[in-house]
């Protein structure tokens, strides 16, 4: 059953139109330089995500936001997302990498969905978030997280 779900998710990623891929890549290009702001928005929206990182447990988010450790970690997370976006519609290797690092840590589907919601909220405040952009990002996250969830 998981194979069928995964096959459907990969097919969905492959079904992203060139226009959708272009919209996702261009809007991401406008925000990828603000990795600290993106991670801050994610942690602010769901403190359980911040609590999943031992170096940030129990620390005041506003106090750590300006630190080098936070900036480095934000760069890793946003960089990984950038790799997914750059490789669209080919998400397979990124799915396996994310599952390999997040499944053993007990990251939940809810936390992934909260990451998605916080990232989208961040995007809405920083790009021209049209209906077409919304549909493109929705299809991208549906395909990527659908494939991740099938393996978790």
Swiss-Prot record:
Indicate the secretion signal residues.
1-15
Q: What family name appears in the similarity comment? A: Belongs to the globin family.
Q: Which UniProt keywords apply?
A: Heme, Iron, Metal-binding, Oxygen transport, Signal, Transport
Pfam families per record: Globin
Q: Which gene encodes it?
A: CTT-E
What protein is this chain from? Globin CTT-E/E'
The keyword Metal-binding appears for this protein: yes
Segments forming domain Globin: 16-152
- Organism of provenance: Chironomus thummi thummi (Midge)
Give the top-rank taxon of the lineage listed in the UniProt record for this protein.
Eukaryota
Q: Name one GO cellular component term.
A: extracellular region
The family database entries (Gene3D superfamilies) matched by this protein are listed as: Globins (1.10.490.10)
Organism taxonomic ancestry: Eukaryota, Metazoa, Ecdysozoa, Arthropoda, Hexapoda
MF terms (GO), sorted A to Z: heme binding; metal ion binding; oxygen binding; oxygen carrier activity
């Amino acid at each position: 059953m998981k194979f069928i779900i995964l096959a459907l998710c990969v097919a969905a990623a492959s079904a992203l139109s060139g226009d959708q891929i272009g919209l996702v890549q261009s809007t991401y290009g406008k925000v990828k330089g603000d990795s600290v702001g993106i991670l801050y928005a994610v942690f602010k929206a769901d403190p359980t995500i911040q609590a999943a990182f031992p170096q940030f447990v129990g620390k005041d988010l506003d106090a750590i936001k300006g630190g080098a450790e936070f900036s480095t970690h934000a760069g890793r997370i946003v960089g990984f997302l950038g790799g997914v976006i750059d490789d669209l519609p080919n998400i397979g290797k990124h799915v396996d990498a994310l599952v390999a690092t997040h499944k053993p840590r007990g990251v939940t589907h809810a936390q992934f969905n909260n990451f998605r919601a916080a990232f989208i909220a961040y995007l809405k405040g920083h790009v021209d978030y049209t209906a077409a952009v919304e549909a493109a990002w929705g299809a991208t996250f549906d395909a990527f997280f659908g494939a991740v969830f099938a393996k978790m």
